[in-house]
């Protein structure tokens, strides 16, 4: 069994290759080598769908809870970490989980990933401080990476190739459902119970998933595995440390710069230098490891793969900047509840989800994918620019329409690089190529959210000196995002709200920049009809 990877539901080619390529039709017929009764199979499938739903929910459920979290912990400066900590560990450990599934029994390795996810959820739910919450989010990300990779790997050993797309599509639908309901569930818990239930909800549902896998999935020992030295070499622990260390240094520099420390301070410069050094060492180490690297050098040499990865990094950054900061705008500036802010972001998420499905079907029928990337990135940039115009009293028609426009742009382009890569890559390389793209795409989320947070904080502090002179900025930072109208003295409130709008707009400038860069990156692809492409890209 080879490394499993996470794929979108409309990418049938990769779903059929999640264990790696098979050389003959006879081998394909033998792929389903764990036989379960119909009842046991259904219960295992339910367990997998629940696990994917929870892992996917953690991407989105926190967005509407963040303002209340900043109220409780007085941690406005940590907003970027609440998303980035999860993205970093999910991206950095996905390849490691894929290899662990080949080294150890599939059942117990999968249950270990559930344990990590549940442990992180407990830490988040019981977190006494912002730092504890960030640590919990990072542990959740480790578990989520194992759940994504392992769920598709289990499907690969339970059903033959011809039947995998419909079952994997079911898990993909679970991912899409979680994306839509996440902000709604998060907002409802935050408004009516506590934001902590955004994480506690994982415990009973995850427990059911764990129980079904434990009782009904047959344990399968690995066919073969290297010795401990070989395993450590293939797991690339040094690469893991370098990439996590690099991104952590980058985020710390952005968090400190212009807020708690001057941009030219030793701490900020030092962390930026450490980021560059770690990235250089990571690139060298990946090249030196060759086929055992997290990011295979052969993959990056292929134009479609590195351009697709770059585009995915940029468009995902633009998407998450808007997704994470819209609830802050609604709750802090417009003063609505967390549950209402979740409802108000539905137009954006529905537009993304609907367009991903529709464009996937259109590309499958016509074979033309390249134009959708250009159109999608352009619309995303324009939509982000329109959202930039939000002010303290933007009417419903404005924030609904502009969200839909931006969501359409993201939706029509988001999955296109995956489809292009899978259509222009040899079957044997599809899992590795897709894993490379998803690794870089997820890192884009960490970079995008943290960059937007730096822009938000710096602009907020600068504008407060103009719009609310005489008010101590620390009061605003300690107030949290949704407690402004309760904490800020009335004579300063309007000025603080205007400063918040300025900070929000600066976030959108970051999103506009990422969207514009994605538009330019799209031209790096060759115009091709993927229905006529069978050979690997030259």
Curated annotation (Swiss-Prot):
SUPFAM superfamilies for this protein: MFS general substrate transporter
Region feature Disordered, mapped onto this chain: 1-22
Transmembrane segments: 42-62, 78-98, 114-134, 139-159, 169-189, 197-217, 237-257, 265-285, 310-330, 343-363, 370-390, 400-420, 430-450, 507-527
Induction note: Expression is down-regulated in the presence of TIBA or CHP, and induced in the presence of H(2)O(2), clotrimazole, or vinclozolin. Expression is regulated by the stress-responsive transcription regulator Yap1 but not the Hog1 MAP kinase.
GO CC, alphabetical: plasma membrane
Membrane topology listed for this record: Multi-pass membrane protein
PROSITE patterns associated with the record: MFS (PS50850)
InterPro entries on file: MFS, MFS_dom, MFS_trans_sf
Domain of life: Eukaryota
CDD domains: MFS_Azr1_MDR_like (cd17502)
Pfam family, one: MFS_1
Reported consequences of knocking out the gene: Leads to a decreased production of conidia and a reduced radial growth by about 20% on potato dextrose agar plates. Also leads to increased sensitivity to the xenobiotics 2,3,5-triiodobenzoic acid (TIBA) and 2-chloro-5-hydroxypyridine (CHP), CuCl(2) and several fungicides including clotrimazole, fludioxonil, vinclozolin, and iprodione. Also increases the sensitivity to potassium superoxide KO(2) and the singlet oxygen-generating compound hematoporphyrin.
Main location: membrane
GO molecular function: transmembrane transporter activity
Alphabetized UniProt keyword annotations: Cell membrane, Membrane, Transmembrane, Transmembrane helix, Transport
Keyword Transmembrane helix annotated: yes
Cellular compartments annotated: Cell membrane
PANTHER family for this protein: MAJOR FACILITATOR SUPERFAMILY (PTHR23501), MAJOR FACILITATOR SUPERFAMILY (MFS) PROFILE DOMAIN-CONTAINING PROTEIN-RELATED (PTHR23501:SF177)
Protein family membership: Belongs to the major facilitator superfamily.
Function according to Swiss-Prot or TrEMBL: MFS-type efflux pump involved in the modulation susceptibility to various compounds including the xenobiotics 2,3,5-triiodobenzoic acid (TIBA) and 2-chloro-5-hydroxypyridine (CHP), CuCl(2) several fungicides (clotrimazole, fludioxonil, vinclozolin, and iprodione), potassium superoxide KO(2), and the singlet oxygen-generating compound hematoporphyrin.
This protein's name: MFS-type transporter MFS54
Native source organism of the sequence: Alternaria alternata
Gene name of this polypeptide: MFS54
């Amino acid at each position: 069994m080879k490394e499993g990877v996470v794929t979108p539901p409309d990418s049938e080619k990769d779903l059929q290759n999640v264990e790696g390529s098979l050389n003959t039709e006879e081998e394909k017929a033998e792929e389903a080598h764990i036989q379960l009764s119909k009842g046991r199979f259904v219960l295992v499938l339910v367990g997998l769908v629940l696990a994917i739903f929870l892992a996917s929910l953690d991407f989105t459920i926190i967005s509407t809870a963040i303002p209340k979290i900043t109220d409780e912990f007085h941690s406005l400066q940590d907003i970027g970490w609440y998303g980035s900590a999860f993205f970093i560990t999910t991206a950095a450990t996905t390849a490691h989980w894929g290899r662990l599934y080949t080294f150890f029994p599939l059942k117990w390795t999968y249950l270990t990933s559930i344990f990590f996810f549940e442990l992180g959820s407990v830490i988040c739910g019981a977190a006494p401080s912002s730092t504890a919450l960030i640590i919990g989010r990072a542990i959740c990300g480790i578990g989520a990476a194992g759940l994504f990779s392992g769920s598709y790997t289990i499907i690969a050993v339970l059903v033959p190739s011809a039947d995998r797309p419909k079952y994997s599509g079911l898990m993909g639908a679970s991912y899409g459902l979680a994306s839509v309901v996440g902000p709604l569930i998060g907002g409802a818990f935050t408004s009516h119970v506590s934001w902590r239930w955004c994480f506690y909800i994982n415990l009973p549902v995850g427990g059911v998933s764990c129980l079904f896998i434990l009782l009904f999935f047959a344990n399968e020992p690995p066919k073969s595995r290297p010795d401990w030295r070989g395993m450590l070499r293939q797991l690339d622990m040094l690469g893991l440390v370098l990439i996590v260390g690099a991104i952590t240094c980058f985020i710390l520099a952005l968090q400190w710069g212009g807020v708690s420390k001057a941009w030219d301070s030793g701490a900020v410069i030092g962390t930026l230098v450490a980021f560059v050094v770690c990235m250089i060492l990571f690139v060298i180490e990946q090249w030196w490891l060759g086929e055992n690297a997290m990011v295979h050098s052969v993959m990056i040499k292929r134009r479609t793969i590195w351009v697709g990865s770059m585009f995915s990094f940029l468009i995902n950054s633009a998407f998450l900047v808007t997704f994470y900061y819209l609830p802050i705008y609604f709750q802090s500036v417009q003063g609505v509840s967390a549950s209402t802010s979740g409802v108000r972001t539905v137009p954006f998420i529905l537009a993304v989800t609907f367009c991903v499905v529709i464009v996937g079907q259109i590309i499958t029928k016509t074979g033309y994918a390249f134009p959708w990337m250009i159109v999608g990135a352009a619309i995303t940039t324009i939509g982000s620019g329109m959202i930039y115009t939000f002010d303290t009293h933007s009417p419903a028609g404005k924030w609904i329409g502009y969200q839909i426009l931006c969501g359409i742009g993201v939706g029509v382009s988001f999955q296109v690089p995956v489809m292009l890569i899978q259509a222009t890559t040899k079957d044997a390389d599809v899992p590795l190529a897709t894993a490379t793209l998803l690794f870089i795409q997820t890192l884009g989320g960490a970079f995008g959210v943290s960059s937007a947070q730096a822009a938000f904080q710096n602009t907020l502090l600068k504008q407060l000196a103009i719009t609310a002179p005489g008010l101590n900025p620390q009061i605003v930072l300690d107030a949290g995002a949704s407690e402004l109208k309760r904490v800020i003295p009335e004579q300063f409130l309007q000025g603080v709200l205007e400063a918040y709008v300025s900070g929000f707009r600066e976030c959108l400038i970051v999103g506009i920049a990422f969207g514009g860069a994605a538009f330019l990156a799209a031209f790096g692809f060759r115009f091709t009809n993927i229905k006529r492409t069978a050979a690997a890209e030259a």
